[in-house]
Amino acid sequence: RTSKPYQPTDQERKLINSTSGLGTAARQYSRPVSGPTLYSFGSIQAGEVRWKGMVISAPTGTAVKAIASGRVILAGHLNGYGYMVIVKHGDSDLSLYGFNQAVFVKQGQLVSAGQTIAQVGNTGELSKPALYFGISRKGVPVNPAGWIK
């Protein structure tokens, strides 16, 4: 059975096209880790549950880099995501980095684009090492693929 690629809702399209801390989706940021995408935004995770970010395969211990400068609002364990770092960009954009084996930043810390913030692990819901990467705009998960090269 083949499933159709995920199509954003009208609300998601409006959010993606609005400007905020990360700007419009123009593939302007480097990937947080190099590696193939295991799961894309909107693909089926289990039953009717869909991924709200993307999962990128990378070896355990690979450096996870912030895609843009911002302030860390969470650095620690989050159920389902393992060790997670969430960076706030501007007023309403968040980048999320999960499934890590180690976190190198603290809540409240300012980070720069390209700064190592964590190490890839398998502390989330997968049995193999990978990075969960997501972007949220105004509290709504949006497809992060549009922002990264």
Language-model features: locations:
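Short beta-alpha junctions and helix-cap segments that line functional grooves
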Residues: 51-52, 99-100, 121, 130-131
